[in-house]
Amino acid sequence: MSMDNLVRLVEKDQYKQLPDFRPGDTVKVHVKIVEGGKERIQIFEGIVIKIRGSGLGKTFTVRKIASGGIGVERTFPYHSPVVQKIEIVKKAVTRRAKLYYIRDIRGKIRLKERKE
């Protein structure tokens, strides 16, 4: 068995079935957090501003506005065991793959809703 086949075999078990989402979509990411001996689920809701990579190395970044108007960005590995599930709250139409310009916008961000 070649090394390439061995890597594919190991990676196959790591893949997760998560919903398809795009930059601009509002998502709820359910994250498992371990504190001491306890585990709990924390929900991080925000707008997907970028998706990069492919395969097991695929990541996505979600931005939300926390209390006090401070922007919080968090990058998640797509196939990580820490990510329990992803819920799509709202789908949006964007013309860019990376929505970095959202960082400079103050107040509520209006994105056109995508109909399917």
From Swiss-Prot:
<dbReference type="GO" id="GO:0022625">
    <property type="term" value="C:cytosolic large ribosomal subunit"/>
</dbReference>
<keyword id="KW-0687">Ribonucleoprotein</keyword>
<dbReference type="Pfam" id="PF01245">
    <property type="entry name" value="Ribosomal_L19"/>
</dbReference>
<dbReference type="InterPro" id="IPR038657">
    <property type="entry name" value="Ribosomal_bL19_sf"/>
</dbReference>
<dbReference type="GO" id="GO:0006412">
    <property type="term" value="P:translation"/>
</dbReference>
<dbReference type="GO" id="GO:0003735">
    <property type="term" value="F:structural constituent of ribosome"/>
</dbReference>
<protein>
    <recommendedName>
        <fullName>Large ribosomal subunit protein bL19</fullName>
    </recommendedName>
</protein>
<comment type="similarity">
    <text>Belongs to the bacterial ribosomal protein bL19 family.</text>
</comment>
<comment type="function">
    <text>This protein is located at the 30S-50S ribosomal subunit interface and may play a role in the structure and function of the aminoacyl-tRNA binding site.</text>
</comment>
<dbReference type="InterPro" id="IPR018257">
    <property type="entry name" value="Ribosomal_bL19_CS"/>
</dbReference>
<dbReference type="InterPro" id="IPR001857">
    <property type="entry name" value="Ribosomal_bL19"/>
</dbReference>
<keyword id="KW-0689">Ribosomal protein</keyword>
<dbReference type="InterPro" id="IPR008991">
    <property type="entry name" value="Translation_prot_SH3-like_sf"/>
</dbReference>
